[in-house]
């Protein structure tokens, strides 16, 4: 999502929300959980407002964009709650943009700490137009084929969490950064160009304007109901192994939040058993609580999609440390500086 779009969303939110008061909580969030009607966010936000009387002021943008906005507002924070994905949540923590807060659900959530907590499980995925392509690209090398020239697009590393995940997945699949950047340099010949948001690529694939794009499992499964030509795939490495980077939605309380107590209430609400039980039903995500296992068809479909695909994750703190240098190198090899 472009910064101008983020600004427009912010203006809309401020114009449509009540005057600044104790009955408001402001959320800066990565896209994906508010897609479509009756989304998980929408249902939980409505339930939260009904239970507490606290209105949600919602601003949406790319995973890196929302953190950049927090950083710019450091001296005058406007948000109470941040939802983004790795490695941007680690960057926010390192830049001291997050406040200490242990959630009520911390003991039931692996990887939760005093600065942030996983909110919804999710994984990097890729999508293709199944009407125009008889089969999905089988491997990373297949994506270099000339038939994908100007028919392939992935969101921009450093701006979009899913785009950053593509770069990290390449590191994993190719076994080294050098090999990965060499590949991504070649892939650029087919790449349409930059995209600050991943979510909008699905419609382009569905219409056939492009054949292949990146995404994430939760968002793509939710979008497929409205985009019938889209199917999910994972390209294999040279050993024939398919793998998917785990990129959960992660939530944290903003340092200096104007309505900190309301932010804490919302975070605890979204991590409650009741809310977590419905994340697959409403938005195709997977709950992060170890004591919640949904039985709905969406949850079954999400777990089935991952069969034969190995999930993995790096040391996110290490990723955050080298991210700026890696993004700079990506711009250099793709000649997109």
Curated annotation (Swiss-Prot):
<keyword id="KW-0813">Transport</keyword>
<dbReference type="GO" id="GO:0030976">
    <property type="term" value="F:thiamine pyrophosphate binding"/>
</dbReference>
<dbReference type="InterPro" id="IPR017637">
    <property type="entry name" value="AminoethylPonate_ABC-bd"/>
</dbReference>
<dbReference type="GO" id="GO:0030975">
    <property type="term" value="F:thiamine binding"/>
</dbReference>
<dbReference type="GO" id="GO:0030288">
    <property type="term" value="C:outer membrane-bounded periplasmic space"/>
</dbReference>
<dbReference type="InterPro" id="IPR006059">
    <property type="entry name" value="SBP"/>
</dbReference>
<dbReference type="Pfam" id="PF01547">
    <property type="entry name" value="SBP_bac_1"/>
</dbReference>
<protein>
    <recommendedName>
        <fullName>Putative 2-aminoethylphosphonate-binding periplasmic protein</fullName>
    </recommendedName>
</protein>
<keyword id="KW-0732">Signal</keyword>
<dbReference type="GO" id="GO:0015888">
    <property type="term" value="P:thiamine transport"/>
</dbReference>
<comment type="function">
    <text>Probably part of the PhnSTUV complex (TC 3.A.1.11.5) involved in 2-aminoethylphosphonate import.</text>
</comment>
<keyword id="KW-0574">Periplasm</keyword>
<comment type="similarity">
    <text>Belongs to the bacterial solute-binding protein 1 family.</text>
</comment>
<feature type="signal peptide">
    <location>
        <begin position="1"/>
        <end position="21"/>
    </location>
</feature>
């Amino acid at each position: 999502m472009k910064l101008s779009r983020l600004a427009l969303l912010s203006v809309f939110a401020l114009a449509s929300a009540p005057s600044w008061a104790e009955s408001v909580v402001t959320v800066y969030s990565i896209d994906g959980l508010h897609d479509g009607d009756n989304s998980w966010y929408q249902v939980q936000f409505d339930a939260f407002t009904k239970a507490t009387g606290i209105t949600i002021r919602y601003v949406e943008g790319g995973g890196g964009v929302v953190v950049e906005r927090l950083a710019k507002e450091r001296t005058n924070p406007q948000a109470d709650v941040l939802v983004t994905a790795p490695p941007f949540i680690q960057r926010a923590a390192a830049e001291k943009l997050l406040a200490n807060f242990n959630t009520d659900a911390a003991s039931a959530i692996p990887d939760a700490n005093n600065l942030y907590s996983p909110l919804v499980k999710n994984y990097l995925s890729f999508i293709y137009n199944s009407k125009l392509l008889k089969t999905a690209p089988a491997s990373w090398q297949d994506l270099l084929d000339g038939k994908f020239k100007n028919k392939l697009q992935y969101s921009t590393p450093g701006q979009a969490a899913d785009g950053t995940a593509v770069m990290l997945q390449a590191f994993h699949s190719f076994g080294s950064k050098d090999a990965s950047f060499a590949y991504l340099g070649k892939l650029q010949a087919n790449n349409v160009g930059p995209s600050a948001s991943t979510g909008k690529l699905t419609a382009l694939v569905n219409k056939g304007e492009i054949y292949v794009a990146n995404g994430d499992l939760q968002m793509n499964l939710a979008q497929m109901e409205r985009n019938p030509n889209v199917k999910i795939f994972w390209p294999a490495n040279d050993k024939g192994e398919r793998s998917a980077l785990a990129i959960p939605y992660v939530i944290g309380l903003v340092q200096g939040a104007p309505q900190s107590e309301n932010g804490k209430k919302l975070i605890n609400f979204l991590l409650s058993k009741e809310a977590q039980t419905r994340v697959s039903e409403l938005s195709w995500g997977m709950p992060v609580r170890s004591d919640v296992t949904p039985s709905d068809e969406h949850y079954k479909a999400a777990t089935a999609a991952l069969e034969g695909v190995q999930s993995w994750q790096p040391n996110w703190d290490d990723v955050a440390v080298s991210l700026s240098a890696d993004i700079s190198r990506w711009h250099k090899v793709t000649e997109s500086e």
